[in-house]
Amino acid sequence: MKYIDKVAWLLIKDNKILSTRSKGKDTFYIPGGKRELGETDIQTLVREIKEELDVDIIKESVNYYGTFTAQSHGDIAGVKVQMKCYLGLYEGTLTASSEIAEYRWLSSDDIEIISHVDKLIFFSLLKSEIIF
């Protein structure tokens, strides 16, 4: 079994979670991405969020939320994504980068347009009554 190691930023506003859709895709993903060689989770998170949304994560505000594993969306069976999720504040104005078609605040009504691992995260946030 192959695992794709990723980190994600859980940004909640008005009981909804920030999600992004890459250009050419129809599925939304929680912002974040794969680590580069030698990076810590926080370094990866800061870099990926700056690249995708042009904001600066406030490192001192970052808190671990949980790790979620599911079939990788769009990959062959047996390829799994392991997503380490963090909550944290930011500075700046959210702006979709050139690789991001749009960002959107999603609720439980949007469960059909998100990836497999994101569904597990959504269910956890719903159970904790963090999103609705």
Residue ranges and their predicted role:
Residues D56-G66:
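A short coil-to-beta-strand element that immediately follows conserved catalytic motifs
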